[in-house]
Each structure stands twice: as C-alpha cells, then as structure tokens.
Amino acid sequence: MSGYGGFALRRAGQAVVVVLLTYVFTFWVISVLPGDPVTTTLRNPQNGFTEEEIARIVSYYGLDRPVLVQLWESLSRFVTGDLGVSLRSNRSVADMIGEVLPSTLVLAAASLTIAVVLSFAIAFGVHYLPRPFSTALRSVPSLFLSVPGFLVGLLLIQVFSFGLGLFRAIDTDGPVATFFAALTLGIWVSAQIAEVLIANLDHEAAQEYAGVARSRGLGRLRMLLKHLLKPSSLPVVTVLALMIGEVLGGAVITEAVFGRTGIGNLVERSVASQDLPVLQAVVTLAAVVFVVVNLLADLVYPLLDPRVTLQARPEVGANA
Amino acid sequence: MAPQDRLTSTLTRPASTTTAPLLQVSGLSVAYGGRQVVSGVDLALGAGGSLALIGESGSGKSTIARALLRLLPASGRATGHVELAGREVLGLPERRFRPLRGRTLGFVPQDPASALNPVRTIGVQALEAAELVDGLAKEDRREAVLETFAQVGLTDPQRVFAAHPHELSGGMLQRVLIGLAVLPRPSLLVADEPTSALDVTIQKRILDLLSTLRADLGISLLLITHDLAIAAERAESLIVLKDGRIQEAGTTAEVFANPTSAYARQLHADVPALNPDRYADLRAVGEGRAGDPARIEVQGVTKTFGSLTAVDDVSFAVPAGTTHALVGESGSGKTTAIRLLLGLEQPDSGRIVVAGEELHGRSHASLRSVRRHLQLVYQNPFTSLDPTWKVERLVREPLDRYRIGDPASRRELVRETLRSVGLGEELVSRKPSALSGGQRQRVAIARALVLRPDVIVLDEPTSALDVSVQADIVETLLRLQADLGLTYVFVSHDLSLVRQLAHTVSVMRTGRVVEHGTVASIFDSPQEEYTRTLLASLPVGAA
C-alpha cells in the first residue's frame, strides 16, 4: 500500500500548490485592475476624509507599500488562516463567509444529492423499463440541459409556492424552500451526470463480459445492479467532481431566484462594491473546494477500480 | 457410427439419448437489419456428442452461436426453429428462456481477457454460476466453485477466487470461464473459438480440458472454430460454413476422407497443418542457396528493459535468399528480436550485420541507408496502413522518401510492384477501407517490396487473415523469394505455417534461443523438451 500512500501524498502536495497559485493569481489580477477601490472610496467627497486621514488609513492597511510586499504579507496571513478585513463593512472576511457558507453548503449538498438520485433514476429507467418508456427517458437529459435554471426556479416557485402554497417564497431558509432551490440546481446537474451514465451503461452492456454473464442466466435487474452499474459509475466520480464547480457557479443564480443569502449573494454584493478582500477570499475558497473535491476523486478512484495502477510498471512484452 | 451411438460406449453418464437429439436446428436464418448473414442452417447434435462449426470470417459461425445462446445484438433477428432438449426455444420469451441459460446451455467465449467483469472479483462472478446448481446450499457454493477451479486445472483456487480478471493470464482466465460454464452441469456447451486468443501450448491444454470434461460430465460440445485441424481433432462431426450457408456436413472422418464440396476441398488444401509440403517446389529454390554466405548475422545480442531480459544472447545467421523463422509464444522475445534487427532498438551487447553492414553504432542517416535494404511487413494489415491514403500513395511513399526516380517512373514502379503481388491496376486509387484483409496485406508487401530490398522481416504476416487468404499470401511471398532471391525473417507462433515456408528455424523462449536448425531437423528430431512440447501442441488434424 506504500504505492498508494506516496500517490496520495504527491496529489495532496499538488493540490496545495494549486491553491497557493490561485491565491497569487487572484491577487495579481486585482492589483493590475484599473481603479483602486480604497482610494476611490476614501476620496469620495461625501465621506469627507482629509488627505492626512486618507494617508493614515492607507498606511494602516499597508496599501502604500510595493505590491510584492503586500502580496507576501497577504499570503502569509492567508497561510495562517487570516483572510483579512472587508473594505465595506470593516468586518473580518472569515466571519462574513462563515455567516453565509452554511446556507450555500446546504444548498450545494442537497442539489448534488438530488442530482445523483435523479440521474441514476433516469439511467436506470432507460436501461430497465420496456421500450416506449426507455426511449422517452433517453431524451430527458437533453431536455433538462436546455431549460435555463432560473426558469425552472421561477416555475417551481410559481407552482409550489404561489399555486400550492407548500412554502412561502420569502421564508427562504425553510426545509421545503431549500428543497425546491436544490431541485432547481439539481435538475440541471443531473442531466450531465445522467448523460455520462447512460452512455457508459450502453457501452458496458455491449461488452463481451455482459453477454457471458447473461449466458449464466442473470436477469436484467441483476445484470444492471451487479455487473453494469459499477464500471459505469466510475467515470461519474470524475464528472461529479467537476460538477461541484458548476454547483457553486449555479448557486449564484439559484440564490438570487429564491432570495437566499449565500456565497452567491455575497459575491454579488462584493462585486458591486468592489470589496476586494472578500472577492479574493471567495475565489480562493472556490479553488480550495474544487481542488479538494478533485483530490478526493483521484484518491477514491484507485480504490474503486482494481485496474488502475499507480506506479508505472516495468515494461513487459505481453507476458501471458 | 452416429455421434450419439459412439457416445454410449465411451461415457460414464448413462445415455438417455438415443431418441431425439439434444439440439436440433432447422432453417435457422439471421439478419442484421436487412443484411442476411445466416441462411437456412440445419444442424443436429446428440447428447454427449460434439459438433464443430467451421468457417472463415463472415461465414456466420459466431452468429449461429449467438443466435442459439440468444445473445444477438439488438439489431439481429433470428428466424427458424431451434429445439433444445425437445423444446422450441427460439420464440421463447426471455423470461422463460432464462432458466435454461447456464443450466442447460453453457457458453465459453472467444477472448477470455474481456469475458469477465473487470471490476469484480472472479469469485463473486463464479458464485453466480454456482447459484444455478439446484439444491446447492448457499454456504456450499464457495466450496463448489473452488472444487471446479481445481477440476479445470487451476493450481491455486483460493487465489483465483480472490483475484480480479486482470491479475490472471489468458490461459488461466479461459480455465475459469470453462469452469463457470460447466459448474451448473449444462447439457450443451457452446464454445466460440475458445483458444484462438491463446498461445499454442495453452491452446492444447484448454482443448484437452474441454475434451476431458465432455467425457467425464457427458456434456455435448458445439465448437466454433476457423481452424480445420482443431475441429478435426476435437469433434465427431463437422459443418463447413461459407457466407452463412452450409457447404458440407457429416462426420469428421467422412468430410476428411471425401470432401464433396469445392469449398471444403479448398479449405482442406489451405490448412498448413494438413499440408506441410504444399510449397515444396518453391521452397526448394531457397534450399539450394543454404550454403551461400549469410545475408543477416546476429551474434550474441542481448537487450534488457529494466529487470527484464527480453532478448538474451541470441545468435542466428540467414543465408541470402532463404527464410529464417523465429518461433515462440507470447513473451518469448521474438518481437524485441526483430525490433533490434530493424534498428528500432539498440542492443545492450552483441552485433547485427545486414548485407555486410554493421547495424549499430551508426548515425541516423547511414542507418537510413541500411534500412532501405531492410523492410518490414507488419502483423495486422487492418492497422498498419494509413486509412486516409490511397493504395498508390501508400506504395509510392518509400520511393518518395528515398527520392528514387522521377514521378513517372515511380508511378510505373508502383504499378509493376502491385502486379507482382497480384493486385490489379484498378485498385491503385482505392483506400484501405475498400480492400479486403488479403488485399491490404498484399499492399503492405508491395510497399516493402517497392524499394527492392534484400531482406524483408515478416512479423506474423498472416495471423490476422483467414486460412484461404493466408495460403494465397504465403504463395505470393514464396514466389517472390524464388524470383528475386529475397531473404526473409519470418516471425510466427504458427509452427505448421513455419514448416510450410521456412528453411531454418530458431525456437525462442523467455528471450533465449532454445534450439535452432533446419526445418527438417527441428520438426523431425527436436532435441529440446520445449520444442517437443510446442510440436506436440499442434493439432494433428485427421481423426
């Protein structure tokens, strides 16, 4: 298992490097952007700061020093877990993210769960149901993909909140409202997983081993569950890891439609007000999530598929 | 003597079978979409009997097997009658056919490496077969599987049970698959080319195993094969198929003694194992050159990859105008040996001299000039030709590379070379996809020939081709050798083919030459145990 340990360590090391690079890159992009939000704000005549006060504030935040020094300080703070202070509210960025993160995490987790359940249900239906139903189900993923998320959200609110009164559209964090918000996001994500899964099931079902297993008298359900599902699901792990990014992106719209206060909402406000430390933190957070999830996918894969080997074996001429 | 009568005298299981045959097929036709691939096939197989379906690619033999097993792809439609143990099964709904799967009708597939689910352990898949045994308690299933593994000659059943398919060799996997097929004691076993993906010594062991199990367990065998010699050795009756129709049917002895159809006669004449001296005349031309100076000299060549010694102190010499065969099973080092000979790999030690020129320690440019005299015909004509190029360009490319002649003379040379390998003018503007396998390999040979090389390395040049096509290609190669005095290095696992066309042989095993000599001395009086094993593995044909 030392091969696996080394592999895990190597991948984890790469992940750390990616996160640090993302942080530096975001910092750089922000520093070269035209317009300096700090001075724009301070020099706004409505705020009535004197030049002396401005200079004091600028030096307090270290903004008068060279960019590289600022980067170094910001990076060393980041490494110790200090994300800095918001320019708008003067509150700790970590606190601000901490406030909205749970809501987004709940939404993301719920929508991914819904997406997985939905996509497996669709793929199962395609492969198990008799003909007219399975053919109809095959087109469902394309349908899901082509309807914009906000439209689905508005429809769901119209029908289930205003129409049936299952939840109040303003009571945004209740379980029922959360479910429908997650459904909005999940439907779209499920389509992409289902497409991969259906294609994989088709592929596996046409393999020689599937025919041989059928010749052992296995029924359709057992073929599906015992033989085809696992090899077909393996690539889904990778797709799922990529979907995490989509879910975070999609959360911005979904949160807006359902009026939830989450990371998406925070990003929206911070962009509008050029609250750079918050943006920097959110981008880095997104990178961390992305990297961690993909790292997990990489680490899980060799455990799921016995054929995946971690070390290049010495080249051997097909030794039977 | 009909198969079912012979059975009563040799089998331990009481024959309940002198009445209706176990499998009775009449008027079976199969179509994919609108394309008819099997037309009106009749066959009968008694309990405990054995029947071989023989044919080349496209003959419909595998389609018949799949139709009987009801494993045709969704586009396939089978019509006609299939009676299994007195019951019509072709029209049976899947739900009612399923109980027959495994229990009555077992299946041994062609390529063992792809016939087991790669992400599940062998044991878990074997337990599925054990479930089909009526009255076997759940806790006894594992024991039954391990017993079966031992029975099919797997030495470490526990390890096999816990292994994943990719951890076992092809021969072991085929044993597993045979074990899984016979575990529920079916009355009929359908084996679709069960050994064509395996090395010759393993092939023999697997066929022996099938024969033994058939005798011990009284299972009928429907053997699908392209190899007439195997069929003759292993089946009581034969059916010869071509283009989905039966050409000839009868007991093996009858068909061999007295083939009535032209196709069966031709097939018989084309099988190398049955006709060792078919090309004796053409070969005699090279035989006369045996004393000539060597065109190729390989002296003490060794090549290692990491800890693996792929080629270990190999030496051989090939007189000009003769054929030297390198024979061995997978992993024997024959492929590495020819890569060294072609200058594609550098040896760790030893020297290789081609036409008086040292091959190694050369600059790129001078290696190129040696290569002009040293051409390769690759194993698989379906992958060795660029599918987007026309035949003309494929054959002309070496001339362009070496800047030989002007465009007009190149064109003429291409046509002349194509004629010499038996390809007509009309093919020059075709792409490989519009050619048959045999035509493609002729193009590959023409491409090697167009530079007028001294030496051609033939790497299993016919292993992807049908036997009748193989015979044509071999004949072409030998005629070219007789006319042009070419020197061949012929790499093959097929000993019968080697016997037909080679003059001298090196038998390789795990990188070493275990024995070398003239064809006659190797085949008639082999000195080494391994050579004897290889020769004993050859199907001898006539029963």
Q: Would you name each region that the model predicts?
A:
Chain B
Residues 77-88, 350-358, 370:
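Conserved ABC transporter NBD signature motif
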Residues 140-159, 409-426, 535-536:
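Conserved ABC ATPase "signature" region
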Residues 249-250, 516-517:
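ABC ATPase "signature
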Residues 185, 452:
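Conserved catalytic motifs of ABC-family nucleotide-binding domains
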Residues 89-106, 124, 132, 254-259, ...:
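ABC ATPase NBD coupling module
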Residues 164-168, 172, 431-435, 439:
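Conserved ABC ATPase signature
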Residues 69, 342:
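Helix-to-loop junction immediately C-terminal to a conserved catalytic motif
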